[in-house]
Amino acid sequence: MKKNFVNLKGNKLEIRWIGELVKKSEPVIVFLHEGLGCVDLWRDFPATLYKTLKIPSLLYSRQGYGRSSPSKVPKSLDFMHKEALEILPRLLDALEIERAVLFGHSDGASISLINCGGLQDKRIKGLVLLAPHVFVEDISISSIQKAKLEFEKGNLREKLMKYHFSNVDCAFWGWAGAWLDEDFLKWNIEEYLAGINIPVLLIQGEDDQYGTLAQVTAIQNGIGINCTSEIISGCAHSPHLEKPEATLNLVKEFIKGLKF
């Protein structure tokens, strides 16, 4: 397992490879973290998946997260579009990745949808989406408001500091500030769904505190037959951490069935 950094237009992004990319033509699973995530917060799920599939994986922390360069706050409300349509393609170029499966969680899953539907990048062969959002719901805002209170009054800041270091404030406020902005209520990425014509696996916890099953229905309807949806009972917003075995089995079978 190698830790490293890549420079993109003067900004340093933390990356970590699990497994070795021997040939450029080999497929890579690219992990895109949630709104408060980073390389370290994927825990051991990527390594466990690698042991099962033997497909190299790339984890990276977006700017303002983990050990990456800091970012300015407040973020522009199209921050996920910029990540999807500008930063992610640049990262794949810089690392000479020719075939990839995007594995996104929450904001990372939404970024994956925008990237795939907006660019139809031939390098992307499949999407694994955990708890994606395509529009804003009351439950999302309510849970983020609770997180804001915990960050300001509780110990959430201290917990996140262990993973985001000096980025802890720009990581939190970049995320919460955007999602709680009144103008963000209009955020909607359903227009990108019709442009997705590769296989998609969508996994959501039945008890997800950040989104309802309306997200799943919208994505399934928007993408159509290329999308397979799985709802995991007794699970909230992080299936890979809360129900790792069930999630691993679903992901393993899906990726084994892809044509690279």
Q: Over which residues does each language-model region extend?
A:
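Conserved hydrolase catalytic core segment
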Residues: 98-137
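Conserved HGGG/HGGXW glycine-rich cap/lid loop of the alpha/beta-hydrolase fold
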Residues: 18-70
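Active-site loop/oxyanion-hole signature of alpha/beta-hydrolase fold enzymes
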Residues: 59-99
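Catalytic histidine-centered segment of alpha/beta-hydrolase-like enzymes
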Residues: 235-244, 248
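Catalytic histidine neighborhood in serine/cysteine hydrolases
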Residues: 221-238
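Short beta-strand/loop motif that positions the catalytic acidic residue
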Residues: 196, 202-204
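Acidic catalytic loop of the alpha/beta-hydrolase fold
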Residues: 207-211
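Short alpha-helix in the alpha/beta-hydrolase fold that links the catalytic acid
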Residues: 198, 212-221
